[in-house]
C-alpha cells in the first residue's frame, strides 16, 4: 500500500510540474488576446454557415455574425485574425471547405499589400490556433521567414 501511495504521489507531482511548466512556457498572447480566437473557436461551431468571412482584423472588426443573423437570418462565421496574410487566408479557406460548403465566401484582399510576415506574434495568432492538418503544415511552410 505504501508503494502504491508513493507511486501515486510521484505521478501527481509530475503532473503538477508539467502543468506549471506548460503555463510558464505558453506564449502570453495565447490567453490574453482575443485576436486569433475565432480561428480555434470555429472547430466547436456547427458547420452549416451560409457565409464565411476570411481575412485580417478588417474582417473580424467589421462583420458581426450575430447582427447579420438578427437582421437577415443569414448564418455566418468570421475566420479572421490580426495581420492574417493572403496565403494564410488561402489555407484557412481550403481548410474551411473541408468542413463545410458555404454559399458565399467573403475573402478580404487587404493583405495583398504584405509580401512577408509583419511579426512572428501575429503569424502565430493564426497558426497556433488551427488544428493540425495538411493546410496548417502548408501554411507554416509558406509563412516561415528566412531566419526560421
Labelled PLM ranges:
Residues 1-2:
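N-terminal hydrophobic targeting signals that begin at the initiator methionine
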Residues 6-24:
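Hydrophobic membrane-insertion alpha-helices, especially the h-region
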Residues 11-15, 30-37, 61:
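Short, surface-exposed loop/strand segments
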Residues 21-30, 75-83:
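Acidic/glycine-enriched edge-of-secondary-structure segments
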Residues 26-47:
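Alpha-helical transmembrane signal-anchor/signal-peptide segments
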Residues 54, 58-144:
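Membrane-embedded segments
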Residues 148:
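Serine-dependent acyl-ester chemistry module
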Amino acid at each position: 500500500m505504501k508503494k502504491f501511495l508513493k507511486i501515486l504521489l510521484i505521478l501527481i507531482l509530475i503532473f503538477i510540474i508539467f502543468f506549471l511548466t506548460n503555463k510558464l512556457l505558453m506564449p502570453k498572447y495565447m490567453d490574453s488576446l482575443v485576436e486569433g480566437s475565432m480561428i480555434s473557436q470555429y472547430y466547436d461551431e456547427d458547420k452549416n454557415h451560409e457565409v464565411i468571412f476570411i481575412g485580417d482584423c478588417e474582417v473580424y472588426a467589421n462583420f458581426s455574425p450575430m447582427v447579420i443573423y438578427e437582421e437577415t437570418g443569414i448564418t455566418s462565421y468570421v475566420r479572421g485574425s490580426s495581420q492574417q496574410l493572403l496565403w494564410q487566408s488561402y489555407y484557412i479557406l481550403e481548410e474551411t471547405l473541408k468542413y463545410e460548403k458555404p454559399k458565399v465566401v467573403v475573402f478580404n484582399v487587404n493583405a495583398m499589400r504584405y509580401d512577408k510576415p509583419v511579426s512572428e506574434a501575429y503569424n502565430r495568432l493564426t497558426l497556433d490556433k488551427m488544428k493540425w492538418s495538411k493546410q496548417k503544415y502548408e501554411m507554416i511552410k509558406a509563412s516561415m521567414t528566412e531566419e526560421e
